[in-house]
Regions:
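Active-site cavity-forming subdomains of large catalytic enzyme subunits
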Residues: 1-170, 174-175
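Short, well-ordered alpha-helical packing segments
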Residues: 3-10, 36-39, 44-48, 53, ...
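Short, hydrophobic/amphipathic alpha-helical patches that form generic packing surfaces
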Residues: 5-11, 167, 186-197, 217-228
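Internal maturation/activation junctions in enzymes
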Residues: 14-64, 196-206, 210, 214, ...
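Catalytic alpha/beta core of large soluble enzyme barrels
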Residues: 79-82, 127-174, 179-201, 208-211, ...
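Short linear motifs in exposed loops
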Residues: 91, 297-298
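Short linear clamp-binding motif
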Residues: 501-504
Length: 511
């Protein structure tokens, strides 16, 4: 983990400049427990981190299974994730099968490969691929059987890869306008396909591109899109847990229709471009990113996930006096010290210009695009079950995603067994599951101070918006930014991972 030790040195002003994915063997007990007791509390309730384990914060840890795990194994993993946030399972055979879609061209072949791999081992699966679809060189065969590597957010599969990514903001698109949807996904597909012309200087990346050219077209705001498409009844179905009733079956059929149509548009566009320019076709073109930061640009619910609430305060971390944060102040947004800025008594600072303050939180009142639809206010998003989230995630995984779908399923302690059963069944029945993050769910209305997302009422939202207007001294944000940005490069900007997935402060412990 030397790379994580190096990463610690480039974290500036609490702004993450490193993100990693560390994949360990399923039987590596030391790796499985590496992050246990990472955080502890003193007598006053203040959190501190074990300095010997500080570098482990720089990456996610995943255990890779090459056989189908038992229900008990999955249950233990889900339980561990509830208590520590770590211990995720990755099912490698599904990842390898998807990454060989140029030869495993349908579900039956994919499932046959997975069964051979899981029951007879990797070597037998390798021989089966070579005898059925080869012969391949040893180098290419090694590459094909190693395509279960993940990028830091888990949405791209490959081996020695760089992947060109693009994203469609579905919350900006009319569900009834298929032509608009087609244009958006076609534009995204072309924007990544053209980068396949790039030639890497590093030999191993050149070889990987030669064997396995990959692109990834993602979307964000799927939840918003579906609310606009199906209305409040869809939200109520979610609130009921997405049951398998007649109405639910109709909703799922329509969801699948949208997802599959977008996938086909992307693949056809990328392949047409590659054929025209004599490039090898990628065998997987679609993915879903976590989309935390980019979703802020249009107020989209990130990726496939539901939003935190219909209305909330969004807090974004900046270093103190960052030009963007200063421009936000001129634009009317409030700024407060971050969670890591405290006085000598451990109390949060209130004045962003206090000399002891090193980081700022810009507070932005946010309203989702469907907040004012009749009945939408009556839906408690925070009560959406883990199984409902998992079901929607698997819809995306089955009907749109060809790589993997970046997912964080939030769950409560009483949902551990049900969620473990759902994951185990998805793996056991070859339904397409590879890996997903699981996060213990806190109450959306908990009184923790200065959370990244803080749900608010409609009345609070209107009041905060009025205050933004009152404080505004410049109606042109770009002009305000030019006032403070002198064009110099800085070591820090908006936090790359401004989500609620890492709620504990990143301040270093005192010696």
């Amino acid at each position: 983990l030397l790379i994580d030790e190096a990463a610690v040195t480039i974290v500036a002003g609490n702004i993450r400049r490193s993100a990693g994915m560390r994949q360990f063997a399923s039987d590596d007990k030391e790796a499985a427990s590496a992050k246990e007791n990472l955080w502890s509390q003193d007598a006053n309730g203040n959190w501190r981190i074990d300095p010997e384990k500080d570098a482990l914060r720089m990456a996610n840890h995943t255990r890779v299974y090459h056989t189908k795990p038992s229900y008990k194994t999955v249950l233990d993993a889900v339980t561990k994730q509830f208590h520590s946030g770590e211990g995720a399972i990755q099912f490698a055979p599904e990842a390898i099968a998807r990454s060989n879609a140029d030869i495993l061209k349908d579900d039956e072949l994919r499932k046959e490969f997975i069964e051979i791999y899981s029951e007879q081992g990797k070597d037998e699966a390798r021989n089966w691929i070579n005898s059925s679809y080869g012969p391949f060189s040893e180098e290419e065969l090694d590459h094909r059987m190693s395509r279960y590597g993940l990028n830091p957010c888990g949405e791209i599969l490959g081996n020695d890869f760089h992947c060109n990514l693009a994203e469609v903001h579905l919350n900006q698109i009319d569900p009834e306008n298929f032509e608009e949807q087609k244009k958006a996904f076609k534009a995204a597909a072309l924007s990544v396909a053209c980068l396949l012309n790039h030639e890497f200087e590093v030999e191993r990346y050149r070889k990987s591109r030669e064997y396995d050219p990959i692109v990834g077209v993602s979307f964000t705001g799927l939840f918003d899109f579906c609310v606009h498409a199906f209305g409040t009844p869809w939200l109520k179905w979610w609130e009921a847990g997405r049951p398998d009733c007649e109405e639910g079956k109709a909703f799922k059929k329509q969801e699948a229709k949208f997802l599959d149509s977008w996938r086909k548009i992307v693949k056809e566009t990328v392949w047409e471009y590659c054929d025209k320019h004599n490039l090898r076709r990628p065998n997987r073109c679609t993915t879903v990113q976590p989309a935390g930061t980019k979703s802020l640009l249009t107020g989209a619910a990130p990726g496939w996930h539901p939003p935190k609430a219909q209305r909330f305060i969004r807090r974004i971390t900046f270093r103190k006096n960052d030009p963007i944060a200063l421009a936000c102040m001129d634009y009317g947004y409030s700024v407060v010290p971050s969670q890591s800025d405290k006085d000598e008594n451990g109390c949060l600072l209130d004045n962003p210009f206090d000399p002891r303050c090193t980081e700022w939180l810009v507070e932005i009142p946010t309203e989702v695009s469907w907040a004012n639809i009749d009945g939408a206010d009556q839906i408690d998003i925070n009560n959406f079950s883990a199984l409902a989230q998992f079901d929607f995630y698997m819809q995306v995984q089955k009907f749109y995603t060809e790589h993997n779908t970046s997912a964080t399923v939030e769950f409560r302690e009483n949902e551990i067994e049900d969620l473990a059963k759902a994951i185990h069944n998805a793996i056991e029945n070859n339904e397409g599951y590879i890996s997903a993050a699981l996060l213990a769910r806190f109450s959306a209305n908990a009184t923790f101070p200065r959370l990244p997302f803080e749900p608010i009422s409609k009345e609070e939202y209107i009041s905060l918006q009025n205050k933004v207007i009152e404080r505004k001294v410049n109606n042109d944000f770009f002009d305000a930014l030019n006032k403070y940005d002198v064009g110099e490069l800085s070591e820090a900007g908006p936090a790359g991972c401004d989500s609620d997935k890492c709620l504990l402060p990143l301040a270093k412990p005192k010696d």
